[in-house]
Amino acid sequence: MLRYSNLFNPGSNYIYGNAETYGKDREYDIVTCMFAFHEIPKEGHRRILNNSIRISKNKVIIVDISTDYKPSKMMLAGEPYTLEYISNIDKLMEDFSFEKRNLIKGHVDIWTYNKAN
């Protein structure tokens, strides 16, 4: 993903790291986490959100599967945290004051946190 980001946006700086601990305070303009939360145990979500807000100057964007997504049995066999994610993520994002928008009905949601400068 980063390789393609640099291809389409030369001169921009994209970095990846441990989402729970990476970065210095207010080090990045925008922090994103793409299609990861449904792969992570519930306990990690809060740590990731706290850290993302800490290292962001302006905005945090979380993109993941929609909470109205209906996973198949085959998907659930390899995605042990998906049902827990679907059941709990909206409340957690609300607790952190993220705004939710459905990007693709039944498939993709996006949550945005805007920091006051």
Where in this protein do the model-derived segments appear?
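A conserved beta-strand element that flanks and buttresses the S-adenosyl-L-methionine
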Residues: 32
